[in-house]
Regions:
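Flavin (primarily FAD) cofactor-binding/catalytic cores of flavoenzymes
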Residues: 2-136, 142, 183-550
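Flavin (FAD/FMN) cofactor-binding and adjacent substrate-gating region
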Residues: 142-183
């Protein structure tokens, strides 16, 4: 991506006139993982707490005589996890699973506020000078974004205890803001979590390191570290925490004009997507708004992530999945429908909240083959799986098929080094959760003095961010204090590099995008992912704002 395509990549005006700065570490991104790492680098070190033994007696036995977690032997501590009676994730990096079970023991079977087995000791002499840069206006990173215009009052998939950062929990923030205790089993709204994250740096005293609403660019390797040309800063270490959710996948050119049409209840809003982002739009829409939903349906090969949502825990997402399933069954050829006893059907408050048969139409696996703009609406022609074509009149489009991240702030040689591109190949800055996964399995230091944390490791849930942050902090602290052992590289995984761990995409389950042709999509996005002018979606934005304020 060039500076002409994306103004954010242009050097900061007057950067050459700024006084040169030096610091040990630059963290790129101001989201949850950056905040966890900054908290540690300010001198708050994690130790295993023996006030109450961990539910896993073997893990407790391994840690009781060596409680310091910065230098934890991940391989030795996690090698028994696969045979444990406790529930340990087999998908996340072992270091992330280790810290998750210590911070939130047995959280998968008890989502209450269980007692943490991690105590944070303040050791100021271990602090590492660092700065945190993020282009989000407030701390929280992409949690400040609403790129598909869903309601801010949509609940997160994770419970509050799974979204907490060290030193200041969401429960403490809730009590401070509302003057009462947080109810058990709370799924906060996205607005509440955004407010919590923005308040976090000041609450724990790390706001002195945060430079929000700043975009870095032109980062190059030097003889002694790195130079950030956009801000005239030198540093010894880089930590990439920019995530994999900054760029929304763009619709085909023929669909682009639909985004400028303002929806009206009488004419369907076209929603394209099979996951949580598409569901958020359907849930957020006014009750009388008609919706035409285009989605992939392959329950045996690549099922929608909505399928895993239990009706009691996530009634709204389970309800949208039920609508999709009904549409898929209705569209299936008669020869594919299995005869049998009718199943007992259940309903839910969400499914009874509006006349779905009147406002929702789902077209599974339909393809757009033509678009004709007609004044304030458009006629879209779809090809169905059986080869037949149909036409529908629509107003407005939400294209919610996923997001990607970008490492465009690195210059090409450094980008190639980070990605491990063969010599002579052109590196693409657009990345997914799979891009650096193989490197993360081997080491979080993906290039000399360059580390990745958070969703760049392939584990995007906040609960799994602690591990990469603790391990990276240990390396940075040892290097700064002179205790670093030359050539010592701590693996983030106890498994062979050839082991396959499924990437856990999704910002707390949102914006999940499943595509088997990942490399092709990355190439396509690289040429299409541009900054969208704030006024380009006025129609849809004003429609959503009018609804939320009503």
């Amino acid at each position: 991506m060039s500076a002409a395509e994306c103004p954010a990549l242009k050097p900061r005006p007057g950067a050459h006139k700024m006084p040169a700065m030096e610091t040990d570490t630059i963290i790129i991104g101001n989201g949850p993982s950056a905040m966890i790492l900054s908290f540690i680098l300010h001198g708050h070190l994690p130790y295993y707490s023996m006030n109450r033994p961990h539910p896993d007696p073997l893990l407790h036995a391994k840690l009781k005589d060596n409680p310091e977690l910065l230098d934890a032997d991940v391989t030795g501590l996690t090698e028994h996890f696969h045979a444990s009676r406790l529930s340990y994730s087999t998908q996340a990096l072992p270091v992330n699973v280790l810290l998750d079970t210590l911070v939130r023991p047995s959280v998968d079977v008890d989502v209450g506020e269980g007692e943490t087995r991690v105590e944070w000791r303040y050791v100021p002499e271990k602090a590492v000078p660092h700065l945190v840069f993020g282009n989000a206006p407030k701390a929280g990173g992409q949690w400040n974004d609403n790129l598909v215009f869903a309601s801010w009052d949509i609940q997160t998939l994770s419970y509050a205890s799974m979204l907490c950062l060290p030193g200041y929990s969401f429960a403490e923030h809730y009590r401070k803001v509302n003057g009462k205790d947080l109810p058990a089993f709370t799924r906060p709204t996205r607005r509440e979590i955004m407010d919590y994250f923005s308040a976090y740096p000041e609450a724990v005293g790390i706001d002195d390191s945060f430079q929000n609403n700043e975009t870095l660019s032109g980062i190059t390797r030097t003889a002694n570290g790195f130079f950030i040309s956009s801000h005239n800063i030198h540093c010894r270490h880089l930590v990439l925490a920019s995530g994999i959710f900054s760029h929304v996948l763009q619709p085909l050119p023929m669909l682009q004009p639909l985004r400028f049409l303002q929806p009206t209840p009488e004419i369907p809003l076209l929603v394209i997507g099979s996951g949580f982002s598409a569901a958020d739009i359907i849930i957020s829409a006014p009750e009388n708004q008609k919706v035409l939903h285009i989605f992939k349906w392959d329950p045996e090969g690549h099922p929608s992530p909505l399928r895993s949502c239990h009706q009691r825990a996530y009634p709204e997402y389970a309800g949208v999945y039920r609508l999709m399933k009904r549409a898929a069954l209705a569209a299936a050829p008669a020869t594919h429908k299995r005869p049998g006893k009718p199943k007992r059907t259940t309903s839910s408050p969400f499914l009874e909240s509006r006349a779905w048969d009147e406002v929702y139409e789902g077209l599974p696996n339909a393809q757009v083959i033509a678009v004709e703009i007609q004044s304030e609406s458009a006629v879209v022609t779809f090809q169905l799986p059986d080869g037949n074509t149909i036409e529908r009149t629509v107003r407005g489009l939400v294209y919610a098929t996923g997001r990607r991240g970008s490492l465009g702030y690195l210059d090409k040689p450094l980008l190639s080094e980070v990605l491990g591109c063969p010599e002579g190949t052109e590196p693409s800055p657009i990345i997914s959760g799979k891009t650096l996964r193989a490197k993360a399995l081997e080491d979080l230091e993906v290039a000399k003095d360059v580390f990745i944390i958070g969703s760049l490791t392939g584990d995007s849930l906040i609960r799994f961010a602690y591990g990469s942050c603790v391990q990276t902090a240990g390396r940075l602290i040892r290097a700064h204090t002179g205790d670093d052992k030359s050539g010592c590289r701590t693996p983030s995984s106890s498994r062979p590099q050839s082991s396959y761990l499924r990437v856990m995409n999704g910002m707390e389950g949102h914006e999940i995008y499943h595509n088997s042709d990942d490399c092709h999509q990355l190439e396509k996005i690289d040429s299409e992912a541009k900054e969208t002018p704030p006024t380009s979606l006025d129609g849809l934005w004003s429609w959503m704002m009018r609804f939320w304020k009503s």
